[in-house]
Amino acid sequence: MKNPHTPQFVVLYRWKIKPELEDQFAAGWSQATQALLERGSLGSRLHKGNDDTWYAYAQWSSNAAREKAFAATADSPHQAQMREAILESFPPVYLEPIADFLLPPGTAPKTFDGG
């Protein structure tokens, strides 16, 4: 199902983070993501998996928009803060949305129990 608000370009990033620097990584990622929002990013979420891999799901209007934003922020102290905390970085996975049922915050339907 195509949602008219679905981003056309999505990237999944994955890292192994030095355990003692997880807070530093999360802070750097948050600040770097804020800077990218000011340069065309459509938002991102950071997750830590039960496999101790960290994942970020980022949405963009296009790969060109992503590349332009990353070029403008590549030398930021926030990116350096992240790099210092990374034990291993995996290649990004580029995703094309096919079906979209994510709901914006505050728009969740009522649950079956009437909640």
Regions picked out by a protein language model, each given a short descriptive name:
Residues R14-A27:
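Short, surface-exposed ligand-recognition loops at beta-strand->loop->(often short) alpha-helix junctions
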Residues L46-D51:
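A short beta-turn/loop motif at secondary-structure boundaries
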Residues Y94-G115:
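Acidic/histidine-enriched, glycine/proline-rich intrinsically disordered or flexible terminal extensions
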Residues P7-V11:
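Short structural boundary motif marking the start of a folded domain
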Residues M1-P4, D113-G115:
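Basic/polar N-terminal segments that are highly enriched at the extreme N-terminus
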